Amino acid sequence: MTVTGIVAEFNPFHNGHKYLLEQAQGIKVIAMSGNFMQRGEPAIVDKWTRSQMALENGADLVIELPFLVSVQSADYFASGAVSILARLGVDNLCFGTEEMLDYARIGDIYVNKKEEMEAFLKKQSDSLSYPQKMQAMWQEFAGITFSGQTPNHILGLAYTKAASQNGIRLNPIQRQGAGYHSSEKTEIFASATSLRKHQSDRFFVEKGMPNSDLFLNSPQVVWQDYFSLLKYQIMTHSDLTQIYQVNEEIANRIKSQIRYVETVDELVDKVATKRYTKARIRRLLTYILINAVESPIPNAIHVLGFTQKGQQHLKSVKKSVDIVTRIGSQTWDSLTQRADSVYQMGNANIAEQTWGRIPFYQPVSQSDL
């Protein structure tokens, strides 16, 4: 049977995600971000809730991406997630895209010209942002022209690179409805951005999500809920360059601005430059918030939930993969668990995220109904 992998954040889970799951074939394995997102922000609802949303709408198995895979630039995010999916026996990678490119051809180009492409990337000016460098590389070697600020393009190409290195087939699906960052109230296929922005509009949320009651009744957070803690971390840390990926230039910029801003968004605006994108600054602020340092990625894979079909698939791979279904006296990934503890500080109603939690079980897969 085909085992299809999907890399996701589900922040929150919406009708577009449900459509993607409906298009995927076979056993559907989701590698999902935990409580902090790829672009450096807290999830609007916790990872257990988002996992349940996915399992109730077509997913068979949801595993958690470690913190230092989740909160990364597109290439590292995709590479880490796809390598985990490959270990779980995934042979097909499904992802949404706003423009259907010949991803198979692009993957072949990368396999055949990987060293040249990576060398080209390293030669690009440091004045360019990472997305701009990637755009130049793909334009040079694959003839692709696109906006370097379009996240789905950047992620789609990152998935292509990662899948080609793991021998995984690609299954791109045309994105339905609103664009990735659209905040418009497109009711049937609203974007996650729009649903977060208009979360207080119950009618809109109910139209845009298949799990609206679960979402609306769950404790929610935004970046600003952590601003006081972030400010404390910045002002009391003796050397911010000890934090993961924070260099002296960024440390000085953050330190000099934190006294004069009242929101996370203001701080991001003050610190970001053409070279350091807002997404990168948000990631760095997330690392500071968590007090993250460079750490090895855990070998074990943490399971958030499964259906009966997903549980059977886990049994078929457990001899070759170290699976964690309950975190107790032994840690899984100390950095991810620290991130979970910080995440809980954003809302007193957020349930325990780590200790003793067991996977959510959805008895019947939607595809079996």
Curated annotation (Swiss-Prot):
InterPro entries: Rossmann-like_a/b/a_fold (IPR014729), tRNA(Met)_cyd_acetate_ligase (IPR008513). It is an enzyme of class 6 (ligase). It holds the Pfam family HIGH_NTase1. One of its GO terms (cellular component) is cytoplasm. Keywords: ATP-binding, Cytoplasm, Ligase, Nucleotide-binding, RNA-binding, tRNA processing, tRNA-binding. One of its GO terms (molecular function) is ligase activity, forming carbon-nitrogen bonds. One of its GO terms (biological process) is tRNA modification. Its EC number is 6.3.4.-. It is found in: Cytoplasm. Gene3D superfamilies: HUPs (3.40.50.620). ATP binds at residues 7-20, 96, 152, 175. Its main location: cytoplasm. Disulfide bonds: none annotated. It catalyses: cytidine(34) in elongator tRNA(Met) + acetate + ATP = N(4)-acetylcytidine(34) in elongator tRNA(Met) + AMP + diphosphate. PANTHER family: TRNA(MET) CYTIDINE ACETATE LIGASE. Catalyzes the formation of N(4)-acetylcytidine (ac(4)C) at the wobble position of elongator tRNA(Met), using acetate and ATP as substrates. First activates an acetate ion to form acetyladenylate (Ac-AMP) and then transfers the acetyl group to tRNA to form ac(4)C34. Belongs to the TmcAL family. This is tRNA(Met) cytidine acetate ligase. It comes from Streptococcus agalactiae serotype V (strain ATCC BAA-611 / 2603 V/R).
